[in-house]
Amino acid sequence: MSNQMEFIMQLYMMNLMKQQQQMQLQLPQQQQQQQLAGYTYTQNEDISSSTSVQQQQQQQQEQLQQPQPDLRKTRTHKRISSQNTNCSSSRSCSPNSNLIAFQPQQYPGATAATPSTPNSHPSNLVNQMLLQSLPPLTQLMLQQQQQQHLLTTSNLLLTPTHTPSSLGKQDPLQHPLLLGQFAGSEQMATNNFLQSSTVTSTPIEREKAATPAPSAGATAGNLSAAQVKFEQESADDDEDDDKPLSSLTSCSSSGHTNASSEKLLLSGVHPLESTTDSLDSPSMYTPVKQPADSSYGLITPVDSDLTPNTPLQPTQTISLLTPPSSEQSKSLVSLSAASGLDALLQNEEVLKNLRKVSSYLECENSLCRQENLREHFHCHEEPCQGKILSKKDDIIRHLKWHKKRKESLKLGFARFSSSDDCAPAYGEGCAYNWKQTHYHCVYEHCPKVYVSTSDVQMHANFHRKDSEIVNEGFRRFRAHETCRIEDCPFFGKKISHYHCCREGCTHTFKNKADMDKHKTYHLKDHQLKMDGFKKILKTEVCPFDACKFSTVCNHIHCVREGCDYILHSSSQMISHKRKHDRQDGEQAYQQFKIKQDVEESSLDAMPQQQQQQQQQQPTSLSQSQSSSSVCGGSNTSTPLSSLSAEHFLARKRGRPPKKIQLPADAQQSEAKRLKVEDESSNPAMLLPQSQPAAAVHPLTSGLFPGLLPAAAAPGVDPTAPNFQLTHLMALFQLQNPLFYQNLYPGMTQNSSMLGNLAALSAASAAAAAAAAANGAGVQQPKAEFSFKPEFKE
């Protein structure tokens, strides 16, 4: 038994020596960080090597003196006992129960970051090993199995802790089972950061619970939020609940990130990381209040990045992000105003009313000559009328005065400063004249004067609403205003009401909702007037004389001329309007017929006047026509309009004429001739007697007897043959064979007959022309034969 106890004590002392070496390595770094940050650890957290050894030895003696409980405990009993131990603390139920610092220790190669939860009776395993005589190897194996058993039990009770935020902080023990056996439950309750009875542990709670002092796994380049967070615990446990919400949420950030975030905060930009840091985090920095002459946002940034050993200023550790002060906002306004003045001086629209004068010698103003002004300006903008400006400050002040005056005029107010006289425009009774800046309302019948710009805005809104009401066709009178209309039912009653401003309407109402209703009534009334009707309400007196429905019921009058019809429903208007439309159409048609008859009678009188004028013409024209016909020969011709084949093609389709008689001699006028064309079918042949023939020169007709038509002499026989028409027919047959081919399908089988017919027609036309040229002395035989072509169907 003594050998077993010595073996256990040796293992325990070896672990203590390693722990003390680690603590000695970490103490200088802890002291340096505590001096830099100005914080101290509590005595509960600062565990030195000597005190820990003494406390653990006392606990070991107490465990040996305690009676032995039941050695056989199931897994469920161990879980229940561990939960009862964890929830025994009064601080485990609070939301800030994880604020007690836990001392992590280096454990190379460890895989779990959650230490094992100790049992309420850690001496059970020691007593079992002392009472039972087992070889050392068996005892060591049993010890390892129970260690694994406790680790699996704690893993079942807790959520997984391998999260990205906890990968850089591995704080298990080398032999948590041995430390749990010889360490008291109270001491482990202080060092354990999972004291809550619940089984929902989150990485954020672990980060809140851990402190940076004993952490040896953190690298020099990275500082987690838990490493830069120093908690000052008080004696009262309830003070933890009074902390703001920002202290309950923390996130990991590196030292470089903290420095960059401080730079961003100093320049007025809020990074995303600093919004979730705790109060004590160095990344949560508030800009220091600057004096009045400095501008907000122009603070010089930090020169160097923060490192884990960089001292933190008190203003950086204990400060909140606050908006700029009133003095800073004033400096902002001054800077913006300065930039605005430069833009004001560069604006040509503002400077167009300023006239620069280089010297008083060029200026016509007597005041400038009296003062011997050199370079100065004159403002000719209304209402300055040539005000003298000699200094740059005066020019800037005057331009700003004009700008403010224009802005106030947009709101309906005239601005007057303390150096302006408002008496010429608004009388002598102003109490603010020559005293302070004030605003006069420019609207008619409005004597309001204000000093505050907020009152100006409110009064401008009143006039804006009033102008909207006027645009709708109404006028509003408030309770203190008099409408000056004695017939108004609200006259002298001090009631806000409305009047309709439309012509002939005296409607009044006090509810603004009735405005749209009355406006709709006027729109409908206008439409009825366009259709020729007028609607009278029951509440109105009918303007029509002797109307029996006046003030009795709603009715509609027809306002058309000569109509006294009264309608009682809007459905009757359609039929009544159609009746008037029909009557108007009949009247318009009658007027059109009368006008048309007058025009026809005037056209009939015109031909009679033309005939009388033609009869009075001299006979010289007829003599010239007879002489030209003698020179041209005895043949007669038709006008050019008759030479076309239009009338020839206009005849009825069928078989060609059976007989085509060739033209005979001009002297044998008594010979029979086949009438090729009816005179009634050719309107061009029927020339009116009153129409004079075209005068043709006798030489022209003699040179070209066959081409130019000769005027028909009154002494020529009308039965003489027309050679030009016959020649044209033959020529058309030669030029258009397809026409006859389509007209007479049988001709395709005897195409030579068409050529013979064309040749014969051409020969006869040439013979007739030669006979006409030889004169009347040469007699030609009477060629009277018939040509009858045969067609095979």
Swiss-Prot record:
GO biological process: central nervous system development; ganglion mother cell fate determination; generation of neurons; glial cell development; mushroom body development; negative regulation of DNA-templated transcription; neuroblast development; positive regulation of transcription by RNA polymerase II
Disulfide bonds: none
Acidic residues bias: start-end ranges: 233-242
Subcellular compartments: Nucleus
Main location per the UniProt record: nucleus
Modified residues (Phosphothreonine): T211
Keyword tags: Developmental protein, Differentiation, DNA-binding, Metal-binding, Neurogenesis, Nucleus, Phosphoprotein, Repeat, Repressor, Transcription, Transcription regulation, Zinc, Zinc-finger
Cellular component, GO annotation: nucleus
UniProt biased composition (Polar residues): 44-53, 273-284, 630-644
Disulfide bond as UniProt keyword: no
Residue spans, zinc finger C2H2-type: 377-402, 439-463, 498-522, 556-580
Record region (Disordered): 44-101, 199-259, 272-296, 599-682
Highest rank taxon of the organism: Eukaryota
Modified residues (Phosphoserine): S215
Protein function: Transcription factor that specifies expression of key genes in developing central nervous system (CNS). Essential for many, if not all, late developing neuroblastoma (NB) sublineages. Binds to the 5'-[CG]C[CT][CT]AAAAA[AT]-3' DNA sequence, like hb, suggesting that cas and hb act as a late regulators in early and late CNS NB sublineage, respectively. Acts by repressing expression of nub/pdm-1 and pdm2/pdm-2 POU genes, and restrict their pattern of expression in appropriate cells.
Protein name as it appears in the record: Transcription factor castor
Organism per entry: Drosophila melanogaster
Lineage per the UniProt record: Eukaryota, Metazoa, Ecdysozoa, Arthropoda, Hexapoda
Gene designation: cas
